[in-house]
Amino acid sequence: MMTAGITGGVGSGKSTVARALEARGFRRLDSDWIVREQVLADPAVMAALRARYGDAVVKTDTAGEPVAVDRPALAERVFSDDAERLWLEDITHPRVFAAWRAAFAAEPGARWAVEVPLLFEKALENWFDFTVCVACAPAKQLARLEQRGLSRALARQRISKQLPLTRKIDLSDFVLWNEGSPAFLEAQVDRLADALVAA
């Protein structure tokens, strides 16, 4: 088994690179998807969120039972308060790690590309054989986040919660620059895939 942790700034193109590696035969894990579709759907997690924030964050059915997390409302709370963000990470991260372990155990011979936004912030390097940083200029990051519907202020707030991109670049085994054409990025992914397969 070989594992590569794909990180970078928010809006840098981690998912694009991970999907490109998937197209080249790697198995892909998207940590944000795991949080969104599995962890936040866990009844125990919804109960903890409801106990802390009430119905402002957890949607309920007509019987008052929790059915879904209002992710924008949750994001507004945790990205504006470091203590709340750390509390949420304490709940979600162990469940994400459990999902990684289960996936790795199910396909122990696979090559894995795992999207991990906070790879270095949370000192998760030891989970992976290699680390890959997908990078672009800050102006490009902001533009991409605004295209997703975030205001410039919220986009800057989310970027500020991560390590500076220069630090992620310094810590990574491989760096891909995602600011040119799709073909430019694909060529870099080709070289990366060859290097990971040969390692």
Where on the chain are the PLM-derived regions?
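Residue-level signal for inorganic ion chemistry
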Residues: 13, 32, 88, 113, ...
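An amphipathic alpha-helix signature
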Residues: 20, 24, 46-50, 97, ...
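Short, acidic/turn-prone active-site loops that include or flank metal/cofactor-
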Residues: 33-36, 136-139, 160-161, 182
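Well-ordered beta-strand positions
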Residues: 27, 33, 130, 173-174
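Glycine-rich phosphate-binding loop of ATP-dependent small-molecule kinases
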Residues: 1-65, 197-199
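Small-molecule kinase domains that catalyze NTP-dependent phosphoryl transfer to phosphate-bearing small molecules
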Residues: 99, 108, 126-127, 147-199
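ATP-dependent small-molecule kinase phosphotransfer cores
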Residues: 36-110
